[in-house]
Amino acid sequence: MLKIADKQFHSRLFTGTGKFANSQLMSQAIEQSGSQLATMALKRVDIHNQQDDILSPLLSAGVNLLPNTSGAKNAKDAIFAAHLAREALGTNWLKLEIHPDPKYLMPDPIETLAAAEQLVKDGFVVLPYCHADPVLCKRLEEVGCAAVMPLGAPIGSNKGLVSQDFLQIIIDQAKVPVVVDAGIGAPSHAAYAMELGADAVLVNTAIAAARDPIAMARAFKLAVEAGRLAYESGLAGKVSHAVASSPLTSFLDECLS
C-alpha cells in the first residue's frame, strides 16, 4: 500500500489524461490500468462543468484528481493556477509543473522550489515535477512536498530511465515517496523504475499513443506490479563473473574417486 499525505493507493501506476484520441478511450484505458490517481492540465479542463468529458468519467470511476500546472512559466503563474484548481475542483492535491521552454519542457528548478514552498504554506499537497537532481529533491522534501516526481527522460520522449543513476540516489535518500515521471515509454521502463525502488510511476504518452491504448494500459499495470514485487522480494546482486546455478564439482569428485 502506498501512502501519500492523506491518501492510500493500491495501485502504484499513476496516469495522465492527455493525447488520447477521445475521452471514452481515455476512460477505458485508465480503468484497465487500475490507476487511482490521474493528472490533467487545467488548460484542458472546463473546471466550471463537472460533466466535462475529462472530469466526468474520472469522477464516476472514483479516480482521484491531480490537477497540474502545465503551461505555467514561473512560480507566480503556478500559484495562481493552483488556487484556481482548488476552488473549482475541491482538491488541494497538485502536481506542480513549471517549464518555461516549450520545446524541451524542462522543469525550472528555481521557480519550482519557490512555488512549492509557498503552496505548502497555502495548504496544498504538492507533488513537484522536477529534474532528477538529488539536491533539489531533498530541498523540495524539506519545504514540505508530499512526494517528489523526478523525470526519467524528457516529457513524451519515451526514452526510459536516462537519469537512472541520479534516480537511484534520490530513491535511496528520500523520506517521501518518489514517483518517476516523464520519459517512461514501455512497460519494461516502468518495471525497472519499480525494481530500483521507486514508489510509483506516472505514465501518459506511452499509453495514449499506443496502437491499442487499452491493452497497453493493462501491460503497464502488470509491469508495475511485477517490478514492485521484484523489489520487495530482493533482487539477486550483480557479479562480474559467472556463477554456476548447478555446480558439478562435488559430483565429479565422487565419480572420479
Swiss-Prot record:
Residues the record lists as binding 1-deoxy-D-xylulose 5-phosphate: 156, 182-183, 204-205
Cross-referenced InterPro entries, in alphabetical order? Aldolase_TIM (IPR013785), Thiazole_synthase_ThiG (IPR033983), ThiG (IPR008867)
Asked if the record carries the keyword Nucleotide-binding, the reply is: no
Q: What GO cellular component is one of the record's annotations?
A: cytoplasm
Superkingdom of origin organism: Bacteria
Q: Name one GO biological process term.
A: thiamine diphosphate biosynthetic process
Give the enzyme's EC designation: 2.8.1.10
Catalytic residues, per the record, are 95
List, alphabetically, the CDD domains matched: ThiG (cd04728)
The pathway where this protein functions is: Cofactor biosynthesis; thiamine diphosphate biosynthesis
Keyword annotations from UniProtKB, A to Z: Cytoplasm, Schiff base, Thiamine biosynthesis, Transferase
Task: State the compartments where it is located.
Answer: Cytoplasm
- Any Pfam family matching the protein: ThiG
Q: Which reaction does it catalyse?
A: [ThiS sulfur-carrier protein]-C-terminal-Gly-aminoethanethioate + 2-iminoacetate + 1-deoxy-D-xylulose 5-phosphate = [ThiS sulfur-carrier protein]-C-terminal Gly-Gly + 2-[(2R,5Z)-2-carboxy-4-methylthiazol-5(2H)-ylidene]ethyl phosphate + 2 H2O + H(+)
Per its UniProt entry, what is the enzyme's top EC class, as one word?
transferase
Q: Which GO terms describe its molecular function?
A: thiazole synthase activity
Function per UniProt: Catalyzes the rearrangement of 1-deoxy-D-xylulose 5-phosphate (DXP) to produce the thiazole phosphate moiety of thiamine. Sulfur is provided by the thiocarboxylate moiety of the carrier protein ThiS. In vitro, sulfur can be provided by H(2)S.
Query: Member of which family?
Result: Belongs to the ThiG family.
What is the protein's quaternary organization?
Homotetramer. Forms heterodimers with either ThiH or ThiS.
> What name does this protein carry?
Thiazole synthase
Question: Which gene carries the instructions for this protein?
Answer: thiG
